């Protein structure tokens, strides 16, 4: 029977669910982060994801183990209950049950979010020929996480695109809703509010990214690989010139790689 792993990335805005086998991730899903849901409701949602995946690959799926990264502690207990009751497996939670195999140089190691460490680990594993790697995650916050050799050096935490836009909506009247994507490689001088907002946000964050990149390459040992991830990764990669790779589900990739490591070392999962 083939080994199937379940991978759960719990962020402040969304929960990403991945299902994979040894050699690859098969499929992923995105749910809204909602800690008011019951564990039973979350369990049913997990089963719905698995049932859909079975239809896609035309095979029965029995989850043998689960790896979870979470930055929302209130979701941990709910998802643990959901996995144990509905999937008959206990999720292994990063930084609780399993430690990322990077030399962590953060002053207070417990302060680093599991998502940042998993993304950094994935970037390190996926691009082994680079002396240094930087994962740039466009999530609720925009984070830059730096690894040289096998050492997690730390990083930068900047405002997030969506949360910044929501703050603007909250404090400003009459702003229209916008979709943050564009086919243009250069900013357009907006002649309406939607265009002004779209290009202001996209190219504003693009310039921030490129500015930080230009500083980091002077302090990191090279060569340096810059990797974009998160919900806005593809949109930002269209207007940012410094990315070497775009991996929208880098945290799921990292959980999958950690799962493979555990299986290869015969850890109990």
From Swiss-Prot:
Cofactor annotation comment: A monovalent cation. Ammonium or potassium.
Cofactors (names): NH4(+); K(+)
Top-rank lineage group of the source organism: Bacteria
Record-annotated active site: 115 (proton acceptor)
Positions annotated to bind K(+): 137
Annotated residues for binding of substrate: 106, 113-116, 193
GO BP annotation list: coenzyme A biosynthetic process
Keywords: ATP-binding, Coenzyme A biosynthesis, Cytoplasm, Kinase, Metal-binding, Nucleotide-binding, Potassium, Transferase
EC code: 2.7.1.33
Pathway this chain belongs to: Cofactor biosynthesis; coenzyme A biosynthesis; CoA from (R)-pantothenate: step 1/5
Record's signal peptide: none
One Pfam family per UniProt: Pan_kinase
First-tier enzyme category under EC: transferase
GO CC list: cytoplasm
Any GO MF annotation of the entry: ATP binding
Keyword DNA damage belongs to the record: no
Subcellular localization, as worded in the UniProt entry: Cytoplasm
Catalytic activity as recorded in UniProt: (R)-pantothenate + ATP = (R)-4'-phosphopantothenate + ADP + H(+)
Primary location class: cytoplasm
PANTHER family, A to Z: TYPE III PANTOTHENATE KINASE
Family under the similarity heading: Belongs to the type III pantothenate kinase family.
NCBIfam families: baf, PRK13321.1
Subunit structure comment from the entry: Homodimer.
Protein name: Type III pantothenate kinase
Organism: Lawsonia intracellularis (strain PHE/MN1-00)
Highest classification ranks of the organism: Bacteria, Pseudomonadati, Thermodesulfobacteriota, Desulfovibrionia, Desulfovibrionales
């Amino acid at each position: 029977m083939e080994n199937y792993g379940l991978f759960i990335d719990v962020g402040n805005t969304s929960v990403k669910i991945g299902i994979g086998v040894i050699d690859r991730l098969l499929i992923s899903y995105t749910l809204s982060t909602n800690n008011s849901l019951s564990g039973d409701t979350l369990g049913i949602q997990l089963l719905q994801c698995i049932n859909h995946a079975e239809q896609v690959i035309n095979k029965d799926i029995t989850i043998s183990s689960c790896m979870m990264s979470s930055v929302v502690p209130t979701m941990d207990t709910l998802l643990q209950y959901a996995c144990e009751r509905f999937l008959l497996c206990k999720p292994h939670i990063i930084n609780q049950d399993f430690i990322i195999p990077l030399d962590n140089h953060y002053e207070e190691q417990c302060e680093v979010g599991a998502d940042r460490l998993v993304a950094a680990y994935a970037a390190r594993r996926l691009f082994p020929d680079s002396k240094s790697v930087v994962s740039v995650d466009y999530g609720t916050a925009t984070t830059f996480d730096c690894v040289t050799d096998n050492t997690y050096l730390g990083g930068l935490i900047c405002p997030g695109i969506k949360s910044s836009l929501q703050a603007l909506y909250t404090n400003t009247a009459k702003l229209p809703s916008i979709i943050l994507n564009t086919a243009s490689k250069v900013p357009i001088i907006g002649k309406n509010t939607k265009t002004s907002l779209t290009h202001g946000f996209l190219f504003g964050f693009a310039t921030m990214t490129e500015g930080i990149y230009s500083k980091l390459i002077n302090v990191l040992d090279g060569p340096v690989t810059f990797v974009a991830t998160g919900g806005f990764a593809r949109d930002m990669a269209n207007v940012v010139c410094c990315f070497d790779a775009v991996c929208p589900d880098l945290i799921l990739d990292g959980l999958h790689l950690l799962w493979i490591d555990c299986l290869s070392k015969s850890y109990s999962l």
